[in-house]
Curated annotation (Swiss-Prot):
It is found in: Preautophagosomal structure membrane; Endoplasmic reticulum membrane. The keyword Transcription regulation does not apply. The gene is ATG2. It is a peripheral membrane protein. It catalyses: a 1,2-diacyl-sn-glycero-3-phosphocholine(in) = a 1,2-diacyl-sn-glycero-3-phosphocholine(out); a 1,2-diacyl-sn-glycero-3-phospho-L-serine(in) = a 1,2-diacyl-sn-glycero-3-phospho-L-serine(out); a 1,2-diacyl-sn-glycero-3-phosphoethanolamine(in) = a 1,2-diacyl-sn-glycero-3-phosphoethanolamine(out). One of its GO terms (cellular component) is phagophore assembly site membrane. Lipid transfer protein required for autophagosome completion and peroxisome degradation and peroxisome degradation. Tethers the edge of the isolation membrane (IM) to the endoplasmic reticulum (ER) and mediates direct lipid transfer from ER to IM for IM expansion. ATG2 binds to the ER exit site (ERES), which is the membrane source for autophagosome formation, using basic residues in its N-terminal region (NR) and to the expanding edge of the IM through its C-terminal region. The latter binding is assisted by an ATG18-PtdIns3P interaction. This is Autophagy-related protein 2. It comes from the Eukaryota. The keyword DNA damage does not apply. InterPro entries: ATG2. It comes from Pichia angusta (Yeast). Residues 1747-1765 have a biased composition (Basic and acidic residues).
Length: 1765
């Protein structure tokens, strides 16, 4: 040590030299240096600047460093004491990538070596070093030399001796990290360095991490106002650190050489000595920013405390090699509130640095050298942390305390980490807990009851060839989640999510540049096994218990131990259990398990191929994923009330969480470049994750009383998360059932269980939601509505919540797609079922922000199928056997849903080609806005407005299926019932009528009159005179009111007194209700529009129950009649001839005894005693097939609608019963089998065009009065009625076509052409039905009906009328609904306009029994009506109790009017009278026309000409018509005669006539009819050679009718030749072993006969001789010539055929017989041809005189030319 007499200047320079050797300080100014050398030497330095060149921190660059005061105290006893204060260091990230080389490393060994060199006075070494370290100005500097700072033994001993007596104390340390968008600050109160016995001890006290920029939220408990005043002056002096110029000179430099180059200019212009060149450069820079520093000082942001460390102790051994390092940290406190914003700004700066670093890496890649491998010495032996406390809400003060104590804090206590050796390390956390101090509840903790001394978390790290990390949680974990914690987590999630995404993007951006450094291909896969060691991570936890605390209940989640293995990429747990706990139940409080997830496993090893489906076409595609989660089974069983409670609580919780989530931080994201789509890029999509649930069961119990449980069974559920954020989910199998005791009702199931190739449900979630349904069968149960209505629902809360949610929600769109979907409709009381099959359909649901929703949907190919009893539905196995019968060779046939349902027993009854359904759901707020902006024309606004449009509707019905369909549709919902008291209020509250009467008012007058009573008494002898005229003598007679009702109008009551004269009657009182609307909002409006409706009515019956019932009734009648006949025969044989003669004389007076039965109120089966039972089968078969002519009459048996009364018993002269129903005419067939199935061809066709139906529901409330008030309304003058609903039906045009084979007429009902063309937009039928409540407070409702009909043209054939009567009167008790309300509907008012009718009527039989019974209407059947005209007058009726009474009143009012006033118009249509009337009108024209012309202009000659012309036209036309009738009558007689003699009769005129054509029938029950390959199949358009004929085919509905009408009849039963027989094939279904088993499958042995015979019999139709009329005389002559030639050819063929057969016979007798058979044809056929030629010629002449006659004939008669075409 230097002596005391050494000069002060020399001492300063000596100390300066020593300090410079420490490589710590830059140039030291001597004025700031105080030295006092001696035994107790002291050195004081002020305002020291650190040498930034000597400091090199990996990844960091020191921009500046300074020390305010530094004191060195050197004593002999205490050694060296260094005390620093006010240390300020500013750092910035370095752009130099990779690890620093050895020359840039700063260590304690380097500084110690410099100190040792200074002690040994090796000046030459320092000079050489300065020369070597002088940077070159060259742009390409050489790499610096690597210097080893290993000391010699002497130097090491000297350094160790020096450090052993060194004590370093640093106070007020401030380290500032400057980033591009963030400034962070670390403040340390005190740092102490001691050395004892070779061990270094470093102690850091009071370390704080502050965030300066940007301004962040500090947390709760402090005022977040700028606290810049609290900052000291030294902070403001550092404002120059943020200047942009300095950022450009140092921060943006790549390395230190660039920094030296940037400072060359300042070196050249330095004014100071060479020792302060660097200071002069920096001083110039700082001086330039001095003015700005003063302005920036006022806007300096306040520092927000982020973290605080109370104490940190570091202990290590060694000097050059640090060993046995032990780090002990005290209590660490962290405020979590500012962390998200700080991380966001830091990561944003780091991302920019990474981008610049990656660019500079390419330039310096060639200068990199391989670093030596690090040794395996352990640097850190022990790390201990007393506690880490994180507050998620409170702010952190500068003194290290939280501003608030009652906040949510995470505490990690006693953290230890030890490194045993270089390959093994372990650590633990003793206690982990999340608590809230206000409630003293632990939200996150581990169970210490079993092992209190075991740490909560354990960690092991093993570094050998494989780096293995093992994380163990040996204790069970308890987590309590409440609303506060959930909202807090949601807030931090919303803040941290963009930060994490940005961090991931920063890490991922380094990967492409690392590829470029190695000069490899961008798409090459790198061998990671050779470059780095593989890492493994294993985790094992104990059970986890999560308690979700809601309002008044909680949900507990128990998770079984979780294991994770990174090598296999497997994360699994055995079970996850959810329990529901409700403490409000009191003693019944118990945990209920409601959800169980079994065997959850997540795999992330390798790439898995996942089967999926395209979101638009549902085509199969394959995707790839690295993460796949599989759940073996998930079971949910929950009470429905609890489910509603949970959903409500979660809804409120979701709203709370949504409100707590803040807007994401403005993190600048890197702009993504979208590449165009290509086939290569879209070849295989990559998924983020795939979740598969193999089986899921959901059960909701106790939904409502008597409902049972609702069970969901889902199989093979897949949820795919795509990279673009899209979520795809699909379910392969879905089954939803209602289970109540033994009842299992399916709500949703697979329509075809065999079709498993496509998912039943597919959903796509992105911006919009898309849902696809395929092969699904939905079922609607009417009973469910009744059961679910019994459940009470809080309406007000739901409305409020829905309105609140709709106000905050955004626009959403849900797209639905349907393919091969069926909807089953099950009624409430009936056993029938309707299936609606939808082939394709789409529906778009748009949910708006204003509460308005809109549904737009379209469906194609809708088929409605019906079955009478669900018990008759065949199982899949049974129906599958029938399918094999149809197509036995194809085992992979694809069956449509229509075919499958038909094979199960359903009958198609309706078909719609396309259907459009649009619905609008309006909110009250939106409707009020529309009402204010509405036009004057619109007065009604519906909350739900539905419009349905269909292009074409086809309906095919039989009598039984028609009733079944109507009753089933009516029974789809239980009608609303009201009690009698709710309807009419028969009881009222008692009223004290004398309550306000003063009893003393008339007391005085009474007393006065008492005195004079004697004067007013009547004498006893005076007789009382009674005025007889006082009472109305006509009270018992018909009053004027009754006659007014009959005439359709009302009149006065006719009372003589004038007391009621002041009452004013309003005739339109009942018409006011609802006719003039004010602007109002109604609940619902439904509009249905159908362009074309076709209704086909078939004969026969669809249901097997109906057929069986009729067959059994026939057998019973047959047996009874046979017994009676046997008894009569016995009586006849035992009687004498006289007795028999007396009985025969009385036979004309007594009817033969008959056996009768009435079926379905429309079928009357009757058989005379002793009659041949064969007639039953003949008549029934003939009735359905109608193969006979119109003249056939059955005299002794019938199958008729009517009753079994004695009046309906048929005699030998009667063909009808006494009832209004008609018999079914029966013919003769050889077989006794009955064919009752649906006929192939329809009998009646109803065509409707432009059908519009609108239904307005005005009131949605249902009054249930509870008070029996006296008056209904306070204001009696006010109308208290209420319009409940209005139904408006309009039909543009309708026509009923007659297709009965025995009827030659074409149209049954249509528009009357003579009335003129219809107006555009007018409707043939318009009906308005209003449902009103006369008293709005009562539930009783009435109807107001208004009907208008345009003029009608009727062509009524009696056979068609019988069919329609029998069809309409059919009633099966199975489809009769229970009479819940026996009261009939009351019709308040009925109004119908006058209807003009022109009628043609053709009777065919007369019911004489009905005439004898008094039914005078039966006399109409004696006359044929032709163009009879009548008018049904306008009627207005009031107060009608039911529709039956309405029908009777209409008949009683219209018929007398027609008989009284319009009898002439009716009689003018009689065939004998019509010609006379026409000729009379001609004579009238002959006289009237000249008179009219004379009166007009006085010209007589022109008048006579016009009159004569009119007379000739009318008279000539009638004479020609008379000639046509005469010729036609003659032809009819001749054809009947020919047919009776063995000819073909009128059948020759039928199109497609073939001589001697017979129907093919089975001769035995075991015979199967064959189809040759040349014939067309009955099952479809495709030819099926060898298919067994079966009418009930299973192909798509709608195709059968097209080919059946043109199908050829089956020819030849036993006359098939050998060649044709060889071409046929015999096919037996695969399920049958022999043909003998075929009858067992069918329900009766006559089923096959039902199918074959009808095709032949129904093809034979009667053709009128007036049809196909020629247009003019020329065409008439051509037609006459053709018909004459045809008949002559027929006669010639008969002669040739007879000659041929006679020549082959070889005997004269046979030849004579053959010629005798052909003689009638040879004689009669030429005469028939002549009469037909005359008739056709005359028809041509008639059509020339009156062209309208041709159109009338085409309208009236069937046109065989069109049918043949």
């Amino acid at each position: 040590m230097a002596p005391q007499w050494m000069p002060q200047n020399i001492q300063k320079r000596l100390l300066k030299y020593i300090l410079q050797q420490l490589s710590l300080f830059s140039e030291i100014d001597l004025p700031n240096l105080d030295v006092s050398l001696g035994t107790s030497s002291k050195v004081n330095l002020r305002n020291l600047e650190l040498d930034i060149e000597k400091f090199s921190i990996p990844g960091m660059y020191m921009r500046s460093g300074s020390i305010e005061t530094l004191s060195l105290s050197l004593t002999i006893s205490d050694g060296v004491n260094v005390d620093c204060a006010g240390v300020n260091i500013t750092l910035t990230p370095s752009l130099t990538p990779g690890k620093p080389n050895s020359t840039d490393q700063f260590s304690l060994a380097k500084s110690t070596a410099d100190l040792a060199n200074s002690v040994m006075f090796e000046d030459n070494v320092v000079e050489d070093e300065d020369i070597k370290e002088t940077p070159s100005v060259d742009s390409n500097p050489l790499p610096p030399e690597i210097k080893d700072y290993r000391m010699s033994n002497m130097m090491a001993k000297a350094a160790d001796m020096a450090l052993s007596r060194l004590q370093l104390t640093v106070r007020d340390v401030k380290i500032t990290m400057i980033l591009e968008t963030s400034h962070m600050e670390v403040c340390i109160e005190k740092v102490t360095l001691l050395s004892k016995e070779g061990t270094r001890y470093i102690t850091v006290e009071g370390m704080t991490l502050n965030a300066i920029k940007p301004e962040v939220y500090s947390g709760e408990g402090v005022d977040n106002v700028d606290n810049s005043e609290e900052r000291d002056e030294t902070e403001s002096e550092e404002s120059e650190d943020y200047d942009d110029e300095l950022m450009q000179t140092s921060f943006m430099a790549d390395n230190k050489d660039d920094i030296h180059n940037s400072l060359m200019e300042s070196m050249m212009f330095a004014t100071q000595t060479s020792e302060s060149v660097y200071m002069s450069a920096t001083s110039n820079v700082f001086s330039s920013t001095t003015p700005r520093a003063s302005t920036y000082e006022n806007h300096q942001p306040s520092a927000v405390c982020v973290a605080y460390v109370s104490k940190c102790s570091v202990q290590f051994d060694g000097l050059q090699n640090i060993e046995n390092m032990q780090v002990n940290l005290g209590r660490i406190k962290i405020a979590a509130s500012p962390i998200p914003e700080c991380l966001s700004s830091v990561i944003q700066s780091i991302r920019n640095l990474v981008r610049l670093s990656a660019m500079s890496t390419n330039e310096t890649a060639g200068n990199t050298e391989k670093e030596p491998e690090s040794d395996n010495t352990t640097l850190l032996n022990t790390l201990k942390i007393d506690e880490i406390c994180v507050s998620f809400e409170s702010a952190l003060l500068k003194d290290g305390n939280f501003a608030l104590d009652n906040t949510t804090c995470l505490s990690l206590s006693d953290i230890r980490f030890e490194q045993k050796n270089a390959s093994f390390s372990f650590g633990s956390i003793a206690k982990i807990r999340l608590s809230r101090n206000d409630s003293k509840t632990e939200l996150f903790c581990f169970d210490d009851s079993r092992a209190p001394n075991v740490a909560d978390l354990g960690l092991e790290i093993l570094n050998n060839d494989v780096s293995r990390i093992t994380l163990i949680c040996p204790k069970s974990l308890n987590i309590v989640v409440d609303e506060h914690l959930l909202t807090l987590a949601a807030r931090y999630y919303s803040l941290m999510e963009p930060v994490i995404e940005t961090l991931i993007s920063v890490i991922s951006t380094q990967t492409p540049y690392s590829y470029s450094n190695t000069h490899t291909s961008r798409f090459a896969l790198h061998d990671t096994a050779n470059n780095q060691k593989s890492n493994e991570f294993h985790a094992q936890t104990s059970s986890i218990h999560v308690k979700l605390q809601l309002n008044d209940f909680c949900i507990t989640i128990t998770i079984s131990p979780i294991t994770y293995d990174s090598q296999e990429g497997r994360f699994d747990t055995s079970s996850i259990l959810f329990e529901y706990n409700d403490p409000t139940l009191g003693e019944q409080y118990a945990s209920n398990q409601f959800l169980m997830i079994s065997n959850l496993e997540t795999s992330s090893a390798g790439v898995n191929k996942i089967r999926s489906f395209d979101s638009s076409s549902l085509q199969e595609i394959w995707l790839k994923t690295k993460i796949k989660t599989i759940v073996e089974k998930a079971t949910l069983k929950l009470n429905f009330d609890v489910l509603i409670k949970i959903i409500s609580s979660f809804g409120k919780l979701a709203d709370l969480v949504r409100k707590s989530m803040v807007t994401s931080l403005p993190v600048a994201r890197q702009k993504k470049v979208r590449m165009g789509s290509s086939l290569f890029l879209n070849a295989t999509k990559m998924l983020k994750n795939c979740v598969e649930i193999k089986h899921c069961t959901i059960i909701f119990s106790h939904i409502c009383p008597h409902f049972g449980d609702l069970k969901f069974s889902l199989k093979d559920i897949f949820v795919n998360f795509l990279q673009d954020g899209t979520l795809h989910s699909y379910v392969m199998s879905v089954l939803i059932q209602r289970i109540c005791d033994s009842v299992h009702e399916s709500l949703l199931e697979a329509a075809d269980p065999r079709n498993k190739g496509y998912p039943m449900m597919f959903a796509k979630f992105k911006d919009n939601v898309g849902v696809h349904f395929k092969n699904c069968s939905f079922n609607y149960y009417g009973e469910w509505i009744t059961l679910l209505e019994s459940r009470e629902r809080p309406r007000e809360e739901t409305n409020q919540s829905s309105s609140a949610s709709s106000a905050t929600s955004k626009k959403r769109q849900v797209n639905f797609t349907f393919a091969d979907v069926s909807i089953g409709l099950v009624p409430v009381n009936l056993k029938s079922k309707i299936e609606v099959v939808i082939k394709k359909g789409i529906a778009d649901l748009l949910i708006g922000t204003d509460g308005r929703s809109k549904l737009q949907s379209s469906f194609s190919s809708l088929t409605l199928l019906l079955i009478d009893d669900v018990a008759n539905i065949l199982s899949d196995k049974e129906s599958k056997s029938l399918r094999h019968w149809i197509n036995a060779n194809n085992n992979h046939a694809i069956w449509t849903l229509n075919a499958i349902l038909k094979s199960k027993g359903f009958v198609p009854v309706s078909y719609i080609s396309s259907l459009f359904l649009n619905s609008t759901f309006e909110s009250e707020r939106h409707l009020e806005k529309r009402m204010t902006q509405a036009f004057s024309g619109q007065k009604i606004f519906a909350s739900i407005d539905t419009k349905i449009h269909a292009d074409a509707l086809a309906v095919d019905l039989c009598a039984d299926s028609c009733q079944c369909l109507i009753q089933t549709l009516k029974d789809l919902k239980q009608p609303v019932q009201f009690s009698f008291n709710e309807k009419y209020k028969p009881m009222t509250d008692e009223v004290d009528v004398f309550k306000d009467v003063d009893e003393t008012t008339f007391s005085a007058s009474v007393s006065v009159d008492v005195d004079n009573l004697e004067q007013t008494e009547i004498p006893e002898n005076e007789k009382l005179e009674i005025v007889e005229d006082f009472f109305d003598k006509n009270l018992n007679s018909d009053s004027a009111e009754q006659s007014a009702i009959r005439s359709g109008s009302l009149s006065n009551s006719g009372t003589k007194s004038g007391a009621m004269s002041n009452i004013i009657f309003d005739d339109n009182h009942f018409g006011h209700s609802g006719e003039e609307f004010t602007t109002k909002v109604i609940p619902m409006a439904i509009g249905v529009s159908i362009s074309n409706v076709t209704i086909k009515l078939y004969d026969g019956y669809d249901w097997k129950e109906t057929q069986t019932t009729i067959k059994n009734a026939i057998r019973r009648v047959e047996d009874k009649a046979a017994k009676i006949g046997d008894n009569m025969n016995e009586v006849t044989e035992g009687s004498t001839s006289e007795h028999v003669r007396s009985v025969s004389n009385d036979s004309t007076e007594l009817d033969t005894e008959a056996v009768n039965e009435l079926l379905y109120e429309s079928i009357h089966v009757g058989l005379l005693a002793g009659q041949d039972p064969q007639s039953f089968y003949d008549n029934i078969n003939k009735s359905i097939s109608n193969c006979g002519g119109s003249e056939n009459v059955s005299e002794h048996n019938n199958l008729s609608p009517g009753s079994s009364s004695p009046a309906s018993v048929n005699t030998a002269n009667s063909t009808r019963s006494a009832a209004s129903s008609h018999n079914i005419e029966l013919g003769k067939v050889s077989s006794r089998r009955v064919r009752l199935k649906r006929s192939i061809y329809h009998k009646v066709l109803v065509e409707l065009e432009n059908l519009d139906l609108s239904n307005l529901t005005m009131v949605n409330s249902e009054p249930h009065p509870t008070k029996n008030s006296i008056v209904f309304s306070e204001d009696e003058s006010k109308d208290d009625s209420e319009l409940v609903s209005r139904m408006d039906l309009s039909v543009g045009s309708f026509k009923v076509v007659d297709n009965v084979p025995t009827s030659s007429w074409n149209m049954f009902v249509g528009y009357l052409r003579e009335a003129g063309d219809k107006e555009l937009g007018s409707s043939m039928l318009h009906a308005v039905i209003d449902t009103v409540r006369p008293v709005s407070s009562l539930a009783a409702s009435e109807l107001v009906i208004s009907v208008s009909v345009l003029p009608l043209r009727l062509y009524v054939d009696q056979d068609t009328l019988d069919f329609l009567t029998r069809f309409g009167e059919f009633k099966d008790d199975r489809f009769t609904l229970p009479a819940l309300d026996e009261e009939e509907v009351f019709i308040e008012k009925f109004q119908v306009n006058s209807v003009r009718i022109k009628l043609d009527y053709k009777p065919k039989k007369v019911d004489y029994a009905g005439i004898r019974s008094g039914h005078t209407n039966e006399f109409m059947n004696f006359f044929i009506l032709d163009e009879s005209e009548m008018v049904l007058k306008k009627l207005v009726l009031y107060g009608i109790p039911g529709f039956a009474r309405l029908h009777k009143m209409l008949n009683d009012l219209w018929m007398p009017d027609i008989k009284r006033n319009q009898l002439g118009g009716v009689l003018s249509g009689l065939a004998p009278v019509k010609s006379i009337v026409k000729i009379g009108s001609g004579f009238k024209e002959l006289v009237a026309v000249p008179l009219k012309e004379y009166e007009k202009d006085g010209r007589v000659i022109r008048g006579l000409q016009k009159g004569a012309l009119s007379f000739a036209k009318i008279t000539g036309g009638e004479l020609l018509k008379f000639g046509v009738k005469l010729a036609a009558g003659t032809q009819t007689i001749l054809e009947s005669t020919e047919e009776a003699l063995g000819g073909d009769g009128s059948a020759v005129r039928l199109p497609g006539y073939k001589k001697n054509t017979k129907s093919r029938r089975r001769t035995s029950p075991s015979e199967v009819i064959y189809a040759t390959s040349r014939e067309r199949s009955l099952f479809g358009h495709n030819t099926m050679s060898g298919a067994v004929f079966h009418r009930n085919s299973f192909d798509s509905y709608g195709e059968e009718e097209e080919f059946l009408e043109g199908a050829p009849a089956l020819d030849g039963a036993g006359t098939q030749d050998a060649e044709q027989h060889q071409k046929s094939r015999f096919l037996v279904p695969a399920v049958f072993k022999s043909t003998a088993e075929l009858p067992d499958v069918l329900e009766s042995d006559s089923d096959l006969d039902d199918y074959y015979d009808e095709s032949d019999n129904e093809g034979q139709k009667i053709v009128s001789l007036y049809s196909n009329q020629p247009e003019n005389l020329n065409e008439g002559l051509q037609t006459a010539y053709t018909s004459l030639g045809r008949n002559l050819d027929t006669a010639r063929e008969a002669i040739v055929s007879a000659s041929t057969r006679a020549a082959r016979s070889g005997s004269a007798q046979t030849a004579a017989r053959e010629f005798a058979k052909a003689t009638p044809i040879m004689v009669i056929r030429p005469i028939i041809g002549t009469t037909e030629a005359i008739s056709r010629t005359l028809q041509g002449g008639i059509n020339i005189l009156d062209p309208e006659e041709k159109r009338r004939s085409e309208e009236k008669y069937k046109n065989t030319k069109k049918e043949a075409g």
